Amino acid sequence: MGSPLQVLSDWEGWQQKSSNGLQGVREHYSWQAHAVRYLEVVRPIIDKTEALVRQPPRTRRAMLYHDRAIFTDLDQNLLGDPKSLAILVKVLRENRKCATFGIATGRRLESALKVMKQYGILEPDVLITSGGTEIHYAPKLTQDRGWPRHIEYHWAPSAVRRVLDQLPGLELQPRTEQSRFKISYYIDPRNAPGLDEINKLLHQEELSVTVNLSFGQFLDVLPIRASKGFALRYFAHRWDIPLEHVLAAGGSGADEDMMRGNTLAAVVANRHDEELSQLVDMDRIYFAKQSYAGGILEALDHYDFYNNCTVPSADGTV
């Protein structure tokens, strides 16, 4: 090989040895070489292994083939007009192979199921309950276990109650209306602080929460990561449904964040105007002329939901 001095003084020889060294590094120490060698070692093991048949979870059902979804509130949208509800149920059932049907409600699971059975509402593919703190999937009402782990971040219910229980105009609702991630009050607007003031008081105590007011009389406090809108977006992301293909229909303040952003949004005519006043000037939100389920049917037609599924242009075409 020669002494170091001879190698350094022989420029052509040095160049050759340098080239050989770089080639050796590429052949034996590069990531590509490592990967090739690794595969050579594990290939015999792989060849002897029986392949597993990958099957989708049972709860996914036909949703695997859905490319769009419709979410609606329960009380404000589906109850109140039996004739329109019967037509809507028929339409949803006829299109179930291509579109997910979801209900998002402030009710607890047991209460929502009871009302759905009473009014003949078909079983949804997805049921978001307790204001967006629980997600269940048909056909066995399987609970999404990842959602509670996500929303428990910075949740301190005892501290929240210490702040709110002492305020005038707030009365804690019965235990049946409370849940792990939802604290519910009756609110008397004549005596209670405004929503902004309540949020300010909680913020001063370093409590990060979501506060929802519904129908001017129900106040729900949830973890900062929980709401109907957050739960809807979590579902859409997990099941790979574009928000642009999600129709969200609501009518109260608790539904507002479902209808913001890129969803196809619809507000039924029997809405709570004061709570949804900030949505009036938003382009992507359709304000239906009909109430309850009739307003949802109107929105399905407006967005051509089962065909083009898009926001109409200024001239009314899609």
Feature roles, as predicted:
Residues 85, 222, 229-318:
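Mg2+-dependent phosphoryl-transfer enzymes with acidic/Ser/Thr/Gly-rich catalytic loops
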Residues 1-9, 35-43, 297-304:
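Two-component system phosphotransfer/interaction surface
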Residues 6, 13-28:
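A short, well-ordered alpha-helix in the C-terminal region of glycosyltransferases
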Residues 19-22, 34-41, 283:
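Pol beta-like nucleotidyltransferase catalytic core
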Residues 86-175, 270:
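Active-site phosphate-binding/coordination module
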Residues 63-83, 259:
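Asp-based phosphoryl-transfer active-site loop
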Residues 6, 31-60:
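C-terminal alpha-helical cap of glycosyltransferases
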Residues 159-261:
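Conserved acidic, metal-coordinating active-site core of Asp-based
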